[in-house]
């Protein structure tokens, strides 16, 4: 599940030299325009038919059998097999390894873990995009349940391991999780299945990047066990991202026009990020502050987002789509193909702002309740 930078939760400007798409097609500021993002019953039925056939052999294969999956307990001290002294020694080893990890890395670790723990929200959302009940036996519903079951291990392992480090105010962390699940989410695509799948492509890819970078940072600061855990989570996310990406590639083949317009809608709409309603009972701008830290230390940056966008444009051969596009579909194609230039400029501006603040000697510090209100530079 994961995170985008706060600044990317707002609509993107039109690409330079290209026309903005009509707001009636892609804006999400009114009930009327949101309703226009629905797939017609005929197209919804066509999509369901595809998922009932193609997905059986091309999507479910990305899931691993439960017996071959790692489980959180594989990487945690086991009280049932250790004496009290041995258990105490094992916990002390965890805390000694974690001692050198700086506070800003802990903020990103917690933010990633909290986002993973809001899994009930994500499963509900993905099940609803095709009007499922949550218990259907069709391939899509089976995929969603299997995907969710694999994802569930991520939050479980990270939560337990971070607790054992002794570096965090776990009650504040737990409150944040409860607040986030209770807040729900609206990704701004009005249950359009194509938009929902594109959204999932970006989120799974972003999560892979983010956990991969926390693994790198944990290793750099000497906690090889935590680095391995983050790396395992990242590997799962990479596999899930590949599944959604392959599905979307097939959908572009089957219905290039609707898929293209869905892609443009997701990119231009004011899409709510999975953890954007994050709250700890104290900081109303917690997600923004968490995102600022993530950007600063390189866990997930505007540059990462730009590279990810270019990856999908290439992966889905967006610029080469010719047949099957309506005039509106072609405008959508022009729009998304021009976005990398916009994103590169955003990345450059973000980097320039950071350098100016550093050079001006105007550091900004934010307290995070997760780490006992310690101040972290952003």
UniProtKB/Swiss-Prot annotation:
It catalyses: hexadecanoyl-[ACP] + 2 reduced [2Fe-2S]-[ferredoxin] + O2 + 2 H(+) = (4Z)-hexadecenoyl-[ACP] + 2 oxidized [2Fe-2S]-[ferredoxin] + 2 H2O; octadecanoyl-[ACP] + 2 reduced [2Fe-2S]-[ferredoxin] + O2 + 2 H(+) = (9Z)-octadecenoyl-[ACP] + 2 oxidized [2Fe-2S]-[ferredoxin] + 2 H2O. The keyword Lipid metabolism applies. Binds 2 Fe(2+) ions per subunit. Pathway: Lipid metabolism; fatty acid metabolism. Pfam families: FA_desaturase_2 (PF03405). Fe cation 2 binds at residues 151, 204, 237, 240. This is Palmitoyl-[acyl-carrier-protein] 4-desaturase 1, chloroplastic. It comes from Ophrys sphegodes (Early spider orchid). The gene is SAD1.
